[in-house]
Amino acid sequence: MFSSNTFDINAYLLNLREDTTSIDISRKNLDCLPDLTRFTQLKKLICSHNNISYLPELPVGLLYLDCSHNNIKCITKLNESLEYLNCSFNIELSKMPLLNDKLMLLKCSDNDIGCLPPLKNIEMLCCPRNRLVSLPELPPTLTYLDCTNNGMRDFPCHRFHKGLKTVYCSFNKLTRLPEFNEELEKMICANNQLERLPILNDKLEILECENNKLICLPYFNNSLRWIDCSHNKLEKLPSFNNNLLHITCGHNKLKEIPTLPHLLDFINCESNRIEKLPALNRNLETLICSYNRLTVLPQLNNAVARLDCAHNKLMQLPVLNENMIQLNCTYNKINALPMFNDSLEIIIFSNNPIYTTLYGGNITLHHHRHSYMQNVMDMDEYDEFNTDSITSIRNLSQKVKTLNDFRFLFYSLKYKSCLRNFLWEKIRRPKIEAKYHPDNLHKLLETMSEDDDVSEMWIADN
């Protein structure tokens, strides 16, 4: 029976012409597929998101088949003409049939597959979240590979084939990677057991190798735009190229950061051992440097909008630019705050001397999560903000201005006499002593006689 409560598959198919080239019967609550062989011109069949448990014989000319999100347990044979197959999310599917020579794209993610057949002429292979411990030989036609979340320990080659451009192999047990080919543009190899990386090819643009066992990185090529090497054992980074836009290198053992490239707009170097940061480039928008050993911050450029410098040893902050939106400087030794701009939306500065100065310990913040920033500063994850515990930015700004004005007045008065004494001792006194020194008395007398002559002439004229 091929019907559901709302869809009659037989009636639907009877209304189709036999030369139909495309059929979409997805999400129809079907338990099985009817005979479709009479549609001799059928090229595309979508039967995803049903309850189908097996695939019947299909039209010989079929090129595109999407049977994902079903209950298929076995696929016995593929049409010789099939070019695209998506059989993902059939959680009991444990084996794939032999692939035909024309198949170019295979998606078989989120199944129970333990091994794959020879890949022949595959161009795109997506097989994440299976039980694969290895892959068959990778064909030279392959341009895209996603084998994320398996149990792989190695690749079946020493060097990626020339045409491969994108590789996702995170969440495996890989201890090494093949040499990168010349065309590789994107390598995502996070959450493995890698201790080193191959030399980066010239065209690589994106490298994500976080959560490994890396102790060093290869030199960065000039094309690299994005790197995430966080959660490793790195003690030093190679020099940054001028095209880098995004750097995430937190949770390592870094003591310093190389000179920042001109185009960089994001850097996260939290949870390291850094004592001093380099000068900030003019395009930087987000700086995350929490959980380090910083005692001073570099001057902020006009582009920085998000700054997290929590859990350091800072005693003061640099002047805030007009574009600052979010500031977190909690858990430092800050005893004074700079003036705020009108664009500032969120500031977190608890657990600093200045907080006690402004609020006298009467207003406290709840404990917050110690790590809340990944790719961007996400202040929404803070659960301690409420109307009883946070004063508006405007009121806080007024408090800071009043305090800063008072400090200026206090220190002006306190050091006024010191300044006067300093000027007397260093400038006026030496000049007076030199002028009236006995060695200079004859000069003084000459000056006095000239003064007398001038006085007599003035009296005579008047």
Model features per residue range: what roles?
Residues 33-36, 55-58, 75-78, 93-96, ...:
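Canonical leucine-rich repeat
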Residues 2, 14-52:
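LRR N-terminal entry segment and analogous cap-like coil->beta motifs
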Residues 371-462:
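Cullin-RING E3 adaptor/co-adaptor recruitment helices
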Residues 16-20, 38-43, 60-63, 80-83, ...:
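Leucine-rich repeat
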Residues 7-9, 13-15:
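Catalytic phosphate/metal-binding cores of nucleic-acid and nucleotide-processing enzymes, i.e., regions
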Residues 21-23, 45-47, 63-67, 83-87, ...:
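Conserved hydrophobic beta-strand positions in leucine-rich repeat
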Residues 28, 50, 70, 90-91, ...:
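Consensus "Asn ladder" position of solenoid repeat domains
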Residues 311, 326-335, 341-412:
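Leucine-rich repeat domain C-terminal region
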